[in-house]
Regions:
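Active-site bordering "gate/hinge" segments
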Residues: 1-255, 263, 271-274, 363
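Dual-mode signal for accessory low-complexity, basic/Gly-rich regions
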Residues: 230-392
């Protein structure tokens, strides 16, 4: 019987905020453990929330082999890789930062009210097995979400100040958000024209859609927008999209649910606009004769699968540096909050934009009224593509 052990520990210290004041401080420290056993092409799994002895879970997992769940695939093996990206963050440090930030916001922006949280997260993921696999990922970071409300409006909320960082720099956070809130006070109209440049802080919506379309099983069965198009030029030659497991970029483990570690923590799925890989786990690769790309998902107590959400594991590679130069003097929109939209199966996209700003490539100038935008994946990443820039 081959054995595999997964342990996840998550510690969170949260300063809860209401009406621009710290109202409570809460600490959570949760351990989750899972054990997988493999015998005669079958898998048995046991899991628990809590720090239970491995031997207890091991016995339960062996019993669960009787369920007959097939898993005739080789285990990841002969690799030790331990990485740590951040040390412990004291609870008092979280409270001190929250109080300091709120003092400035109350003083300089009394026309806004702020709520939600300032938190510190410490995480540890480990996976080891009887075949010589020994992986461990440790990290710690500040996570801030301050929902803002203009006191003069009847809205439940009007936007948010957000930040995620291993090393929180208070003055940098305040400097950016002073400009953000000053622009929020300055109400401006939409520039003229049906077609305008739009920038976002991330690319969650298109990457979630692309992640679903790159599912190897869906691709092989003909149910993907990309089915049969491997090797074709689908997007701008400037675009490279990677399956990226670099914790410095993603803040998540560098291995998938089957313990697969990618070379240099990344693998291109689109390279210079060409579709060069789809997403597969061990089962999908073997079943459909596709390259194995290390994209298994699943919880600590689940059978690894390809059927998870892959958008968060994908990333555009930076291909441009100067936003102002790219705009060539044209006014642009910085879409800060756009929820309620989606892609259709053919790649068409539409969404309302709740919070957006007029942007000149260097400065946020003023807050725009709510509007709706629409496009198509082929245009967004083809003729209308401007670039992917580092967040600075």
């Amino acid at each position: 019987v081959k054995q595999e052990f997964i342990t996840i520990r998550e510690k969170e210290t949260t300063a809860r905020i209401q009406a621009s004041q710290v109202q409570a401080v809460r600490i959570k420290d949760i351990t989750k453990k899972g054990v997988r056993v493999y015998q005669d092409g079958k898998i048995g799994i046991a899991g628990i929330v809590g720090d239970t002895e491995d031997s207890v879970l091991l016995q339960e997992a062996v019993t669960n082999l009787e369920a007959g769940i097939e898993y005739p695939f080789p285990l990841s093996k002969d690799l030790k890789d331990h990485r740590s990206y951040g040390g412990p963050i004291a609870a008092q440090e979280v409270v001190n930062e929250a109080e300091a930030i709120l003092a400035v916001l109350r003083d300089e922006f009394p026309d806004f009210s702020f709520s939600e949280f300032v938190a510190a997260n410490e995480i540890e993921y480990s996976m080891r097995n009887s075949e010589g696999l020994d992986l461990k990922y440790q990290d710690a970071y500040f996570n801030i979400t301050l929902i803002l409300k203009e006191k003069a409006t009847a809205n439940l909320f009007d936007g948010a100040l957000v930040c995620g960082s291993r090393r929180f720099e208070r003055e940098k956070f305040l400097s950016f958000n002073r400009e953000f809130l000053a622009a929020y006070r300055n109400k401006v109209e939409l520039p003229e024209g049906e077609k305008l440049p739009v920038f976002t802080l991330g690319a969650d919506a298109p990457l979630e859609f692309i992640g679903r379309a790159l599912n190897g099983e869906r691709y092989a069965k003909g149910g993907s927008l990309f089915s049969g198009r491997l090797g074709e030029q689908l997007f701008s030659e400037r675009i490279t999209i990677e399956l990226n497991r670099d914790p410095l970029l993603k803040g998540s483990p560098f291995f998938d649910a089957e313990g697969v570690v990618l070379p240099n923590d990344r693998l291109a799925v689109f390279e210079a606009g060409k579709l060069v890989n789809v997403l597969t786990d061990k089962k999908t690769a073997l079943l459909y004769d596709l390259p194995h790309t290390g994209a298994a998902t699943g919880g600590y107590d689940d059978v690894p699968t390809i059927d998870g959400a892959h958008g968060r594991s994908l990333a555009f590679k930076t291909d441009a540096q100067d936003i102002a130069a790219a705009l060539k003097g044209q006014p642009a929109i910085f879409a800060f909050m756009a929820s309620g939209g989606d892609f259709t199966a053919d790649g068409s996209y539409a969404t309302p934009v709740q919070v957006a700003f007029l942007f000149d490539g260097k400065r946020i100038i003023g807050k725009l009224p709510e509007f709706a935008m629409r496009s198509h994946l082929d245009k967004m990443l083809g003729e209308d593509y401007i670039g992917t820039f580092d967040n600075t």
